[in-house]
């Protein structure tokens, strides 16, 4: 029996796409494509919705692909919600507003601004930020992340490419993830550093001394 993983819920703030906890991303992609195709007359190009994935920490590595698929179908995600569904609607425990500014060149997203608490930047390729990533902000990238500034927020790189890196002019991040590897206590660095995976663990090295395998 096929389990419905996709649901749309209308709230006072707007339409929310709810993706239930899942085991196989392809099941989500297939149902999402089918559901939106059936609702083709409902959406207009550029429509914005909110996205909530149950157990979103578990599925954070899938976020860039899901948002990319929605964008290709003409739907923009305005916010990422953290919460659970309930009989009376949705219980939201947190939210991240999507950063819309920036341009994409050759698959790389370039954003020239500071990312504030409560803002999220999600892209399926590489990300370059010219500015600071403040505590409470989050970047999720399919490829590498380079920040020309200070990082105190959450960086998730290599969600599609395990050989990706993270680089910043200085950092004291809340969390760093590269592919399936997670570092929760990265420490503080007041010089340019490069973060990458070496011998199945995340390492942080001075940019002038970094050596890749």
Swiss-Prot record:
Return the SUPFAM superfamilies for the record.
Cell-division inhibitor MinC, C-terminal domain, Cell-division inhibitor MinC, N-terminal domain
InterPro entries on file: CAP/MinC_C, MinC, MinC_C_sf, MinC_N, Septum_form_inhib_MinC_C
* GO terms (BP aspect): cell morphogenesis; division septum assembly; regulation of cell division; regulation of cell septum assembly
Keywords assigned: Cell cycle, Cell division, Septation
Q: Which Pfam families match?
A: MinC_C, MinC_N
Function, as annotated, reads: Cell division inhibitor that blocks the formation of polar Z ring septums. Rapidly oscillates between the poles of the cell to destabilize FtsZ filaments that have formed before they mature into polar Z rings. Prevents FtsZ polymerization.
Q: Which HAMAP family match?
A: MinC
Recorded family membership: Belongs to the MinC family.
Known partners and oligomeric status: Interacts with MinD and FtsZ.
By its UniProt entry, which NCBIfam families does this protein fall under?
minC, PRK13992.1
What is the designated name of this protein? Probable septum site-determining protein MinC
- Its gene name is minC
